[in-house]
Amino acid sequence: MAQVSMRDMLNAGVHYGHQTRYWNPKMKPFIFGARNGVHVINLEKTLPLFNEALAELTRISSNNGKVLFVGTKRAASEAVKAAAVDCQQFYVNHRWLGGMLTNWKTVRQSIKRLKDLEAQTQDGTFDKITKKEALMRTRELEKLELSLGGIKDMAGLPDAIFVIGADHEHIAIKEANNLGIPVFAIVDTNSTPDGINYIIPGNDDATRAIQLYLDAASAAVKEGRGSNVEAELQIPAE
């Protein structure tokens, strides 16, 4: 069972919040105190919440659920992509386009265009058009890949989103709320826990902390996917 320990979180600096003057009072239940003008997150609150979230991610994945990893801050971007790829799920790590979930029909058209352009790079189309046109299409492809590359094979809305940095990704959270998609999110002391189904109070800036969250979430998803495969193998042939 995918779990984290108190020692793991301490070593990764999960307990370091933001400066006290930037705090959101709604995070008070999860704050232990302050040290040198910086809030300290109560890891005795975080630990059970995080492990509960991991168990639910495993359950969702065991039912073939799709998990969308979201983290567009510079500190999280590459790690978000790596974690999603590692567990064969989906990601948005560059910029959240408004309507990415709530206007899925339009996003799907953009994904179709992305795949068409990818096909053109392989089937010789680019050799048959002018260099200027080929350059324009290449730039369009690069732009679409940056925005939509992580969801181009998602084939429908996700069953959950796992967010690094609730404050930074508030638009994604709001869209998920509007559609009833469960939200799992790392919530720092300057953020609001509103609209988050699975609150994980913790540092959302430190690279080591971000890596800890993503490694654990990816492991939980892989565990769920593995149990699903095992269940299928045990179904007797008719």
From Swiss-Prot:
GO terms for biological process: translation. InterPro entries: Ribosomal_uS2, Ribosomal_uS2_bac/mit/plastid, Ribosomal_uS2_CS, Ribosomal_uS2_flav_dom_sf. Keywords: Ribonucleoprotein, Ribosomal protein. SUPFAM superfamilies: Ribosomal protein S2 (SSF52313). GO terms for cellular component: cytosolic small ribosomal subunit. The keyword DNA repair does not apply. GO terms for molecular function: structural constituent of ribosome. Belongs to the universal ribosomal protein uS2 family. HAMAP family: Ribosomal_uS2_B. NCBIfam families: rpsB_bact (TIGR01011). This is Small ribosomal subunit protein uS2. It comes from Haemophilus ducreyi (strain 35000HP / ATCC 700724). The gene is rpsB.
